[in-house]
Structure formats: C-alpha cells, structure tokens
C-alpha cells in the first residue's frame, strides 16, 4: 500500500468486540440505519473460525434497516465504536455505549457527509478521511 494511503496507519492490537453476524448502528447520514457484518477485510484466519473485528477495521456489511435505496446493499464500512472495553497504550480503558460503523467506498472515502456521535481515536488515526467529517474524536 502506498505511503499515506487510507488504512495504511499502524494497526495496534485492540480487543475485538465484534464478529461476523454482529448487528451495528450506522452513524452517518448515508441513508442506512442498521447493518450486519458479513466479512472483515484483511483477515486471514483458520478454517471455520469466525472473523473478529475491532475499532478501526474495515468490514463488509449488509444494510438491514434504512432507506429503500440502501436496504439490501452490500457495502464496506469502518468500525468507529465498540462496546467491548479495550486498553490504550497509556493504560486507560475505553468502551462506548454502542457498536457503530461508517459506510465508506473501497478506498476509505465516507459515503455520508457527517458522523453522529464520537469516533474512536484509533479509527480516526487510521482513516484520515473519516476523521475529517467526525464531530467528536475520543
């Protein structure tokens, strides 16, 4: 991946709080309200192991609730919040109230123009285009 590309930032170990089959809230104004994770981009695991996802990961989701144009679409998204607590390098623990994603294009450009609620710092550092439209970064 070229230097400075989307998602090229360092991937720190974060406790995975989501997996394939998890329902997540869509936190942008793309028209989707709720989605289900059906894949994790870049995960190469063992046979029959359910792929885990954490804050900052790009996932493949199917839209379950939203506008008629968005429903039943298979799109990519970035995890911006997770309920499962994870530890930061400075020793603090952080957990959010919900599991949320932002719908993006395959190169990491957000489909919406605003993000509702906070965005984890780990996701903002890894995906600069998501950080640009975030209102709060925690």
UniProtKB/Swiss-Prot annotation:
SMART domains to which the protein is assigned, alphabetical: Ribosomal_L14
BP GO annotations: translation
GO MF: large ribosomal subunit rRNA binding; structural constituent of ribosome
PROSITE patterns: RIBOSOMAL_L14
GO CC terms in record: cytosolic large ribosomal subunit
One Pfam assignment: Ribosomal_L14
Keywords: Ribonucleoprotein, Ribosomal protein, RNA-binding, rRNA-binding
Disulfide-bond pairs as recorded: none
Record function comment: Binds to 23S rRNA. Forms part of two intersubunit bridges in the 70S ribosome.
Subunit structure: Part of the 50S ribosomal subunit. Forms a cluster with proteins L3 and L24e, part of which may contact the 16S rRNA in 2 intersubunit bridges.
Family per similarity comment: Belongs to the universal ribosomal protein uL14 family.
Protein name, as recorded: Large ribosomal subunit protein uL14
Organism: Hyperthermus butylicus (strain DSM 5456 / JCM 9403 / PLM1-5)
Organism phylogeny: Archaea, Thermoproteota, Thermoprotei, Desulfurococcales, Pyrodictiaceae
């Amino acid at each position: 991946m070229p230097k400075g590309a989307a998602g090229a930032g360092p991937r720190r170990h974060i406790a995975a709080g989501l997996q394939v089959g998890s329902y997540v809230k869509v936190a942008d104004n793309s028209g989707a309200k709720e989605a289900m994770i059906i894949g994790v981009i870049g995960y190469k695991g063992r046979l029959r192991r359910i792929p885990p996802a954490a804050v900052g990961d790009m996932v493949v989701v199917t839209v379950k609730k939203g506008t008629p144009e968005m429903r039943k679409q298979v799109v990519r998204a970035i995890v911006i919040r997770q309920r499962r607590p994870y530890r930061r390098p400075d020793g603090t623990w952080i957990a959010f109230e919900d599991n949320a994603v932002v719908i993006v294009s395959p190169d990491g450009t957000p489909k919406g123009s605003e993000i509702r609620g906070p965005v984890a710092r780990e996701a903002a550092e890894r995906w600069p285009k998501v950080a640009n439209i975030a209102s709060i970064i925690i």
